[in-house]
């Protein structure tokens, strides 16, 4: 017998979808969850990142082993709300779909974890050991919340970690890292009619970029053996086999120049220009390697005119894809999903696990598994299937 009806579960999700946490204000969700946990006599604690951003930690059970369940409370910007069919911050149920910002990424997964915690406690189905819920702030950008919890030791004693990001029929045991690398070139501004007495920062930046492309292309020729295999993920998401060449490329290091800035007006030689890259490190080419890779090119071009800044730096995470945690989730999920639809894979994206696990990653079984299609994340008219919330809640309740 469940504590909440299906209608009540949807209302709980609706309540936190209405709390607008676009890259901020997670404290509102923390306060809501604190009241909910208090109602069911579950011990919880709010840990502030700053005035408007906070995490909440809740626990049931005691002793070992310790299983951590995690989800983030922030969502990405909804963009122009006029482009949405339904209001992004009002849950709309239509034809078996739950529309709203965060339904997939990832308030749906978070609320499934919260409901699981409450129902296990209320039904006296407490596990042997401890279940610790970690709801985090700031995952979408700098993972401030996860870093705070890791620094305070909330992951030091855990044996397993489930992050309820949207995964469809997938269960993920590992993922790439993510780095933001900004290269800035400086020059000397002068009137564009006399460029020879100035120093065009764009020229220096282009020299860097041309060398980067050449050396990155050469690196990728040798990037052929990978610890992380993302092919099962792509096969499921695109619905067909991918070539060995594409699977090999996707499983390796990737780097994309995604932002370029330079110059302020057409008749002035620019004294500053910048490129920003998103790099996805892998175990073979980790974050330290990437930093050196960029810095070496800067040194080759002109280190007096070029500088490197790394505002975001999340490491790849690996664990045993045949762990007891992964096997248990797969076995339980097969009661609700066709066995041949379930797959185990590495993930191309990054999660709070990068900040959570750190040096402790070799001692923790990791599973990324939650309701929603990952392709719906960050989209206009984001939705999660109602049945996916139900399946995830049922699955989580049996992993204990």
UniProtKB/Swiss-Prot annotation:
Keywords: Amino-acid biosynthesis, Cobalt, Diaminopimelate biosynthesis, Hydrolase, Lysine biosynthesis, Metal-binding, Zinc. It catalyses: N-succinyl-(2S,6S)-2,6-diaminopimelate + H2O = (2S,6S)-2,6-diaminopimelate + succinate. It holds the Pfam family M20_dimer. Zn(2+) 1 binds at residues 72, 105, 165. PANTHER family: ACETYLORNITHINE DEACETYLASE, PEPTIDASE M20 DIMERISATION DOMAIN-CONTAINING PROTEIN. The gene is dapE. InterPro entries: ArgE/DapE, ArgE/DapE_CS, Bact_exopeptidase_dim_dom, Peptidase_M20, Peptidase_M20_dimer, Peptidase_M20A. GO terms for molecular function: metal ion binding; succinyl-diaminopimelate desuccinylase activity. Binds 2 Zn(2+) or Co(2+) ions per subunit. GO terms for biological process: diaminopimelate biosynthetic process; lysine biosynthetic process via diaminopimelate. It comes from the Bacteria. Its cofactor is Zn(2+); Co(2+). PROSITE patterns: ARGE_DAPE_CPG2_1, ARGE_DAPE_CPG2_2. Zn(2+) 2 binds at residues 105, 140, 378. Pathway: Amino-acid biosynthesis; L-lysine biosynthesis via DAP pathway; LL-2,6-diaminopimelate from (S)-tetrahydrodipicolinate (succinylase route): step 3/3. Its EC number is 3.5.1.18. The active site is at residues 74, 139. Belongs to the peptidase M20A family. This is Probable succinyl-diaminopimelate desuccinylase.
